[in-house]
């Protein structure tokens, strides 16, 4: 059963987007919850201390036990810290070159070693890895590949860390790992909270966009939907924890960068469900020896579903670095030797959005062989009749622009462990609110937004 949870986000207030609907559930279930904020949210340097105390106030609203700041910068001058060489010192937008805490506490590394860490990629990754291993939480919820560079940085570094942790032969740590977006379907979701019919999380698509690219590296149909706490759906906004948490972010009332108000996003964020993708730590390919007839096979079992070719700001869905067979390779073949005999029941293949995996032949060492025609999808799932094997061979007979980012192999009964988590599976049903009450709540909400915007303009030196 889940007794502890670790929630990893880039900036103060991202915990609201990523898990704001679930803190009540965690608290009421007695789950000890730690939130890790990787940056100080100091893009505007004079707001750093204020954002620290806003985060502490949000902690009290959400009633979770521990808040940790890693103390890194909110964006960087020149090369982003993710793209820098391992030990190259980066400078943050606020002019810092080492970790610090903007409030009355110490950042994570200083609390452990009495030393600040220079802003290097290696230190950033090391601090994330250290906090994961120190807490050994039963449940981890981490930010995913949003369009923001800091969000991508944390997601990618986390995946690097988890791949290394899980692949360590002496390690038996197998948490429930969930990845989720702060933007898609949440911060940038539809403005629908005050509608009379409650609607689940939806992703808005602009002209020319498709769901595969917006959800990269996942399939939208594979999402795990958690039912959010009941209080997050109340129209009595003074009792709604998501609205209260957003209201606590006074530095974000009227952004001098975008002109937006954080409260504007409440009707988008306060969904009845929280959507995540399950990164199953029992993927047997992680512990296997993987070889390929050509190309770099290490990408196939490193836990990474995306690796930028050049920069963290790359178009990852079409230009992520993965396994690509050589042009001269007439019959690209992948061979997976498992660490032990397993009963193989499912294979999941993750590709770039512009990669097309056509036909492949699957062979197991017991003589089982089948040909599979892959659907036109960047995530391909292959169900097998639970066959014992020590080796899997996949010969690809047709493809186009092929780049495979990861292969997962599972034994039977390795779906999402609903019986272990404190959450309830979200089941969509028609719930109709009182139309007049919804209208009055929205009217009051809009008046509140106008008021806080005016307050911010009066207080901020940027106007």
PLM feature segments, named:
Residues 1-134, 156-172, 179-183, 231, ...:
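Active-site rim/loop-helix segments in enzyme catalytic domains that contact anionic ligands
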Residues 132, 136-146:
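Proline-aspartate-enriched helix->loop->beta-strand connector
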Residues 424-463:
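Membrane-proximal basic amphipathic "stem/tether" segments
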Residues 278-344, 350-359, 412-438:
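Disordered, acidic Ser/Thr/Pro-rich linker "stalks" and the adjacent N-terminal cap
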Residues 235-283, 344, 411, 415-417, ...:
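C-terminal regulatory/interaction regions
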Residues 43-45, 75-84, 148-152, 186-190, ...:
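Short catalytic/ligand-binding loop motif for oxyanion handling, primarily in non-cytosolic enzymes
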Residues 189-254:
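A conserved mid-domain beta-alpha-beta active-site/ligand-binding segment of alpha/beta enzyme cores
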Residues 327-331, 351-423:
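Trp- and acidic/polar-enriched beta-sheet ligand-binding modules for extracellular glycan
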């Amino acid at each position: 059963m889940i007794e502890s949870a670790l929630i990893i986000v880039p900036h103060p207030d991202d915990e609201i987007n990523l898990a704001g609907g679930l803190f009540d559930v965690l608290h009421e279930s007695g789950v000890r919850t730690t939130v890790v904020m990787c940056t100080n949210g100091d893009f505007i340097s004079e707001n750093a201390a204020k954002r620290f105390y806003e985060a502490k106030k949000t902690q009290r609203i959400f009633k979770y036990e521990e808040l940790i700041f890693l103390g890194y910068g909110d964006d960087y001058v020149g090369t982003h810290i993710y793209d820098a060489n391992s030990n190259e010192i980066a400078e943050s937008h606020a002019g810092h070159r080492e970790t610090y805490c903007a409030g009355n506490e110490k950042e994570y590394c200083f609390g452990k070693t009495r030393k600040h860490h220079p802003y290097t990629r290696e230190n950033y990754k090391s601090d994330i890895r250290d906090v994961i291993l120190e807490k050994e939480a039963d449940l981890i919820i981490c930010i995913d590949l949003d369009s923001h560079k800091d969000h991508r940085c944390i997601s990618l570094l986390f995946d690097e860390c988890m791949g290394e942790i899980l692949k360590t032969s002496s390690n038996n740590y197998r948490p429930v790992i969930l990845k989720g977006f702060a933007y898609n379907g949440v911060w940038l979701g539809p403005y629908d909270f005050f509608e009379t019919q409650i609607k689940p999380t939806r992703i808005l698509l602009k002209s020319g966009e498709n769901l595969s690219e917006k959800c990269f590296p996942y399939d939208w149909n594979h999402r795990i939907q958690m039912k959010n706490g009941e209080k997050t759906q109340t129209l009595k906004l003074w009792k709604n924890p998501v609205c209260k948490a957003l209201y606590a972010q006074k530095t974000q009332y009227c952004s001098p960068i975008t002109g937006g108000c954080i409260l504007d996003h409440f009707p988008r964020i306060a969904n009845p469900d929280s959507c995540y993708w399950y990164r199953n730590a029992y993927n047997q390919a992680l512990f296997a020896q993987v070889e390929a007839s050509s190309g770099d096979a290490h990408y196939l079992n490193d836990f990474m579903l995306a690796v930028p070719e050049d920069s963290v700001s790359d178009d990852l869905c079409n230009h992520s670095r993965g396994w690509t067979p050589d042009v001269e390779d007439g019959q690209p073949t992948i061979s997976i030797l498992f660490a032990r005999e397993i009963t193989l029941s499912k294979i999941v293949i993750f590709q770039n959005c512009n990669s097309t995996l056509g036909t492949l032949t699957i062979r197991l060492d017991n003589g089982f062989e089948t040909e599979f025609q892959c659907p036109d999808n960047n995530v391909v799932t292959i169900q097998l009749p639970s066959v014992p094997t020590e080796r899997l061979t996949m010969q690809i007979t047709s493809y186009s622009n092929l780049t495979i980012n990861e292969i997962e192999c599972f034994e039977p009964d390795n779906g999402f462990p609903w019986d272990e988590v404190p959450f309830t599976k979200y089941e969509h049903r028609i719930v109709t609110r009182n139309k007049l009450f919804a209208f009055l709540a929205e009217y009051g909400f809009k008046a509140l937004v106008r008021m806080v915007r005016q307050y911010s303009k009066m207080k901020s030196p940027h106007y």
